[in-house]
Amino acid sequence: MSQLCPCGSAVEYSLCCHPYVSGEKVAPDPEHLMRSRYCAFVMQDADYLIKTWHPSCGAAALRAELMAGFAHTEWLGLTVFEHCWQDADNIGFVSFVARFTEGGKTGAIIERSRFLKENGQWYYIDGTRPQFGRNDPCPCGSGKKFKKCCGQ
């Protein structure tokens, strides 16, 4: 039996993000690219992360930083809670929560990632980190307050 994809899709990895991470296919939209990039973090694939960063970002210079992060970070799960894009605009956004442990402490990245499509391929550009009040509902959709969920 194959393993489930780390991206949280509940689909086997070989049928989900593997074709993108392996280079067999190009991610068809920002959500698939973001999910496959999360898998690359889980599987410590710096080459895929660098390849899918927009060339203007100079991602190759981040290789050492990525490799150092791999050694100290364990990824625990991904929740995508919003995505929007239009192929005609060549720009898209994906909002997500990625949970991890680092140095024995649990944390979460909550980001609205921006993607750009050039020559038929989507690239990660950058992301913003929205601010949430401690008593706001958690954006991951758990129904809990932010302070009792991803804000810990």
Swiss-Prot record:
It comes from the Bacteria. The gene is ychJ. InterPro entries: NTF2-like_dom_sf, SEC_C_motif, UPF0225, YchJ-like_M. Belongs to the UPF0225 family. Gene3D superfamilies: 3.10.450.50. This is UPF0225 protein YchJ. Pfam families: SEC-C, YchJ_M-like.
